[in-house]
């Protein structure tokens, strides 16, 4: 267990610190999860089998466990809408699933090489853009669940969704210049 202790911490900063401690060739897959995540007993087997069948990037289905308040119910609904459209919907159309930052499995060698170039405040959207740019398809495992707890406070909800909106705009404006080239070269996922 590696404990990251930073004055100002971020998920990416912690992931980068962990990856710097791991040697290439030791592992096949990086699995990104949050500390509160719980998985089914066959979760790792399913992810490993999917990887072994040729998928280098995998997103599993995050489900919120506790829904004691209206805000947490809204949070769970929002996440299921995203699962339906941005993950299952994309895959049904032949496009890559969107990453959600939890229950995400990526080829170890690719991840270790690319994580070094990311900023400490980057998130899964930047990783997703890199995968798509390299035409690495993100598989979605709709029936492989990651159970997550969610802070149900209104302030936390609005902060998270404000960050999500900011990330969407950042991703749009960062990648919009690549749109014509992506379409012309047939990288429809990236477009």
Which residues make up each language-model segment?
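Basic/Trp-rich segment in TM-proximal cytosolic loops or flexible interdomain/linker regions
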Residues: 93-94, 152-191
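Long helical/loop segments within the catalytic core of UDP-sugar-dependent glycosyltransferases
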Residues: 4-16, 22-27, 46-120, 162-173
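Catalytic donor-sugar/metal-binding loop of nucleotide-sugar-dependent glycosyltransferases
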Residues: 128-146
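A short, conserved beta-strand element in the Rossmann-like catalytic core
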Residues: 9, 37-39, 63-65, 126, ...
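Short aromatic/hydrophobic "clamp" motif used to bind/position activated sugar donors
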Residues: 30
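Short, hydrophobic alpha-helical packing/hinge segments within bilobed ligand-binding/sensory domains
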Residues: 14, 127-128
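Acidic donor-binding loop at a coil-to-helix junction in glycosyltransferase catalytic cores
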Residues: 121-127
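Acidic donor-binding/catalytic loop of UDP-sugar-dependent glycosyltransferases
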Residues: 34-50
């Amino acid at each position: 267990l590696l404990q990251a202790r930073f004055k100002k911490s971020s998920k990416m900063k912690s992931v980068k610190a962990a990856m710097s401690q791991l040697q290439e060739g030791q592992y096949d897959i990086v699995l990104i999860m949050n500390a509160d995540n719980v998985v089914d007993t066959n979760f790792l087997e399913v992810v490993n089998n999917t990887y072994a069948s040729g998928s280098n990037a995998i997103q599993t289905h995050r489900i919120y466990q506790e829904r004691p308040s209206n805000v947490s119910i809204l949070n769970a609904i929002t996440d299921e809408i995203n699962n339906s459209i941005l993950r299952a919907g994309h895959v049904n159309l032949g496009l890559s699933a969107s990453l959600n930052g939890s229950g995400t499995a990526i080829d170890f060698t690719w991840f270790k090489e690319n994580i070094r170039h990311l900023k400490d405040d980057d998130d899964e959207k930047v990783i997703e853009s890199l995968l798509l740019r390299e035409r690495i398809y993100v598989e979605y495992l709709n029936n492989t669940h990651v159970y997550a707890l969610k802070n149900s406070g209104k302030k936390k909800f609005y902060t998270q969704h404000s960050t999500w909106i900011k990330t969407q705009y950042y991703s749009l404006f960062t990648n919009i210049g690549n749109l014509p080239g992506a379409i012309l070269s047939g990288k429809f996922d990236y477009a």
